[in-house]
């Protein structure tokens, strides 16, 4: 019964442009910086007969990485994906717990990505902008975002702050705990800077 489905944890959706956070981390890890990136957006990009446009065919012109992220330039991120390759993107996504168990106690659907099956350049292009077969739950993307905000550390989510008895006395309190470092503090600061420009 879909009305009983907790869409925050059990829903699985193509991430779309929020996948650009994953792509940005992949690029940063591969290059060590975002400062070397420059791209001339003409409004669309075509490879092997497959064309991906920017939203409404908008032409962003010459962009650096920060501008490409802030303007959600699809063609720039398609080019980034083609340059990085499937294996690099897949590894970074798995570092962020795609295809992995999440530290949550509610029923949830695992986020999935599979770029290793050779479906060619058009598939990689779509996947680079969060389309294709990649699926993620809203909860998972919120966890990744919170790790960026928390200097790379993913806190273990909890749902109950404290429990009181019938007299109003607190009998149990949940204490925040770190689950895992998803990225370095430096990486988190760089991603945070990108997100603040949106």
Please report, for each region that a protein language model flagged, where it lies by residue.
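Beta-lactam-recognizing serine transpeptidase/beta-lactamase-like catalytic domain environment
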Residues: 1-17, 22-198
């Amino acid at each position: 019964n879909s009305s009983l489905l907790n869409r925050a944890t059990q829903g699985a959706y193509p991430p779309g442009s929020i996948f650009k956070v994953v792509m940005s981390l992949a690029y940063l890890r591969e290059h060590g910086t975002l400062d070397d990136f420059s791209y001339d957006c003409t409004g669309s990009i075509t490879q092997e007969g497959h064309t991906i446009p920017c939203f409404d065919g908008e032409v962003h012109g010459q962009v650096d990485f920060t501008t490409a992220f802030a303007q959600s330039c699809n063609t720039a991120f398609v080019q980034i994906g083609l340059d990085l390759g499937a294996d690099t993107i897949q590894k970074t996504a798995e570092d962020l717990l795609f295809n992995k168990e999440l530290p949550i106690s509610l029923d949830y659907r695992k986020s999935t990505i599979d770029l290793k099956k050779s479906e060619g350049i058009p598939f990689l292009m779509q996947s680079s902008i969060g389309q294709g077969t990649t699926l993620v739950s809203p909860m998972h993307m919120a966890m990744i975002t919170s790790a960026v905000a928390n200097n790379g550390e993913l806190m273990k989510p909890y749902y109950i702050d404290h429990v009181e008895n019938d007299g109003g006395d607190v009998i149990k309190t949940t204490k925040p705990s770190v689950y895992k470092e998803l990225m370095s503090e430096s990486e988190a600061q760089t991603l945070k800077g990108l997100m603040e420009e949106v």
